[in-house]
Amino acid sequence: MSKTWVVVAESSRAKIFQVEKNESHQSLKELEGFTHSTSRSHKNQLNGSQQKDSRDSQLTDSLDSHKDHERGEFARTLGHHLNNARNKGLFKKLILMSPPKFLGDLRKNLGHETNKFVVSAIDKNLVRHNIQEIQAHIPARY
């Protein structure tokens, strides 16, 4: 049986599913879930105040930079996990579902060999959707 994993992720959370198939039916089984709480911090938690002055633009740039950094950290963590899983032979095919920015970050953090296992990359944020909605985006051939 070919093991296909589906990774549904965004900048602060991810879920990993395995495709379960029988003769007439395909379903998803959730294997793991991840959260990156630092990425989910609110603006006020990051800067400690609600200043309204000429520094707002600089503050916004700083917060955007922080968000980019945290998104990259989470992509590295998830990429490392997937690289290890591939080394252990836990999947044979990998389907990625993520918003474009995080999808790019994640692909950069997958090893060359792990990237070879990616059979589909879908640039949609489905991490908060139910299993049926996620499954509807998986091509039937997987």
Predicted regions and their residues:
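Terminal alpha-helical anchor/extension segments at protein ends
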Residues: 1-142
